[in-house]
Amino acid sequence: MTQTLADMRRDYTRDGLSEAQAPLDPFTLFRQWFDDAVKTEQLPVEPNAMTLATVDEDGRPHCRVLLLKGLDERGFTFFSNYESAKGRQLAARPYAAMTFFWPSLERQVRIEGRVERVTPAESDGYFQVRPLGSRIGAWASPQSRVIRDRAELENLLAETEKRFLNQAPHCPPHWGGYRLLPERIEFWQGRPSRLHDRLDYRLQGEAWIRQRLAP
């Protein structure tokens, strides 16, 4: 390494985030920021990529990067194998946090809340628009389980391809969607000298309360 980790930094230069700019509804602000990210972030960056954090039965946190696949007034939707590590963790402790980071915009959004499964119809609706290879892969992969080697996975894939040679794969019972129902959403805008803007929305009853946090 030619540069030490302690020396790796850059200053943020974009405009700030004021209460006057921010709508009272955090979903409105998220959509605005997400639309900005779609227009600004350059490929191969995926603006809908997020880090999802869950907690296991022992209280140990786990995180991984997933893709956001749905957003409405209820919450934020993603899909996974229900029998995966994250699926088992969400079954035991149905709460999670997700973080979006858009470096070109110097923005971050943190979301926390309860997680529930979407309806089977919603899961099937999304499953049917996935590429064929992804649909077959959802049947073939025993996600998060130990396998012997890559060859074992490829053998499982070959067997699954034969199974669905003359029929379209339907949504597996062990696969589907989750919706995070937000209780807190924090918007972070990078500012010079690390004096960042942080607007924090918290759900109280049916109303969102907005407050500013110190950086």
From Swiss-Prot:
PROSITE patterns registered for this protein in UniProt: PYRIDOX_OXIDASE (PS01064)
Matching Pfam families: PNP_phzG_C, PNPOx_N
Top enzyme class: oxidoreductase
Residues the entry annotates as binding FMN: R64, V65, L66, L67, L68, K69, F79, S80, K86, Q108, Q143, S144, W188, R198
Subunit structure: Homodimer.
Function: Catalyzes the oxidation of either pyridoxine 5'-phosphate (PNP) or pyridoxamine 5'-phosphate (PMP) into pyridoxal 5'-phosphate (PLP).
Name by which UniProt lists this protein: Pyridoxine/pyridoxamine 5'-phosphate oxidase
Organism: Ectopseudomonas mendocina (strain ymp) (Pseudomonas mendocina)
Organism placement in taxonomy: Bacteria, Pseudomonadati, Pseudomonadota, Gammaproteobacteria, Pseudomonadales
